[in-house]
Amino acid sequence: MQTIAILGSTGSIGTQALELVRLHPEEFRVVALTARSSREKLFEQVREFRPEVAGLTEPIPMSEIPEDVRFCRWVMGEEALRAAAAEVPADMVLVSVVGIAGLQSVMDALGANRQVLVANKEALVTGGHLVMDAAKRIGKPILPVDSEHSAIFQCLQGAGGNQPVRLLLTASGGPFRTWTREQMQNATRAQALKHPNWSMGAKITIDSASMFNKALEIIEAHWLFDMPPEKIQVVVHPQSIVHSAVEFADGAVLAQLGVPDMRVPIAYAMTYPRRIPTGSKPLDLFSIGTLTFEPGDPVRFPALRLAGECLNAGGAACTILNGANEMAVAAFLRDEIPFGAISRIVEGTLEACGAMPADTLEDIFHADLEARRVAKEIAEKLK
């Protein structure tokens, strides 16, 4: 039996991970659960899974914690993440919190010699070099939970140590796959939130519409698989059945296919290298009939170009891209800027911030704050 700490247990990834624990009680024991502010949902999870540690990063008084969940240790604020990631003994730590706080949690878990399952994009986007160095020091791979990176990771298990020459990173294309750049400029919030295949939170759904989600995944893939950005090709695949693929020197391409169901990559990370039933529907290729593929378009979706530019620039460029995009998306979701302004704000922030170092966590957090400040100023002018 494996013990698991889940950071961000009330979100989409966290709740699906707990579904798998519920399905396989003989496989897993939950030792820590954290949430940001969904206290009632967290209380329910604590009652069911009875962890040793539970916490809320948005603190509440201990008097507001129900008597029947006080059997475990409660931690509030940022300390909740640190306690769950590094203090409570756990075989593995699933980091599914949103935002750059995930970087600190990943580093804390690695520092405590934990097996880390990463469902937080910011950890690798902003601090990929630090994360991979720390993982190398303890001799444990970073296990990706993103469906695309999990697909690549799974394909590489059958590669016999052969290194790929190209990664094919698939993308649904989002709701604006067939729109012109001009049409996208003034797309509404409701239009951008209509994802064709996946049910996700508002931020990641907007990122899918702008393809900044795929830009972040290019950066993640670079660090996870030590692949230069020019060898990572985005392939638009509207059916979301091929989750990604790898190409080898002999021309062979290995791909991972399946219905869109996040329980599959979550379960693979939780049981690696074994596989367990997930409750996912079997893939029926006959009912799908046709799989189609298109090249990613960096003209209509500037995010695809910016990912490679930021990786080649080095330093804190990827951190600046990430922070600026978060601020721009937040402004768009408040109906303060048009959809087309998101990429303009990110490009403007990258230009204004220039070269910044990313040698330490402090450097990265400073660059993130500066990017957010600059992006907010630019967004204010576009209102």
What is the role of each PLM region?
Residues 1-383:
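Catalytic, metal-anchored helix/loop core of enzyme active sites in primary metabolism
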